[in-house]
Regions:
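N-terminal signal peptide c-region/cleavage motif recognized by signal peptidases
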Residues: 14-16
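N-terminal helix-cap/turn-to-beta initiation motif at the start of protein domains
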Residues: 18-27
Length: 153
């Protein structure tokens, strides 16, 4: 019984540590409320200091607009026919950022928009209220869209 309590405490401490409230690292709900994205250090240094992977979907739809089970949803809008069958959960969404002088702001990265199959240049930064500001754009940040993501973990 004592081991079970210790194991439960270690699990809770690990979950709390992974959220890192003073960091962009953690799990975020996208602005449209359709996806949960885990921001974490990239597996490869060539991919930058922070990468994002889709870890959850809320009410996904298939290519015909009909409801799809989250674990069955695929990247049907991808311009590469070879990637249209890949599962959305587990799919890389954000990569290629460079650090800025602010430890919680990253510039010059990329974000994949699964709704239209396009990749945009992006900047991300942790805001003072704990939300994540993401700006996706083509060419110049002046010509883009800003989204505010909410931390889940």
């Amino acid at each position: 019984m004592k081991r079970l309590v210790v194991a439960a405490l270690l699990t809770l401490l690990g979950a709390a540590a992974s959220a890192q409230p003073g960091s962009v690292m953690g799990v975020w709900l996208t602005a449209n409320g359709k996806a949960q994205v885990r921001l974490a250090p990239c597996d490869s240094p060539a991919s930058g200091p922070v990468c994002g992977t889709i870890v959850g979907l809320i009410n996904p739809t298939g290519p015909n607009g009909q409801a799809s089970a989250p674990d069955q949803a695929v990247d049907h809008n991808n311009p590469d026919p070879n990637l249209r069958g890949r599962k959305i959960i587990g799919m890389p969404l954000i990569w290629g950022f460079q650090r800025t002088s602010d430890p919680n702001a990253f510039d010059g990265g990329h974000i994949y928009n699964g709704e239209n199959g396009k990749v945009y240049t992006a900047n991300i930064s942790l805001q003072s209220d704990g939300t994540l500001r993401l700006r996706g754009y083509v060419g110049s940040p002046m010509f883009g869209e800003t989204q505010i993501w909410t931390r889940i973990q």
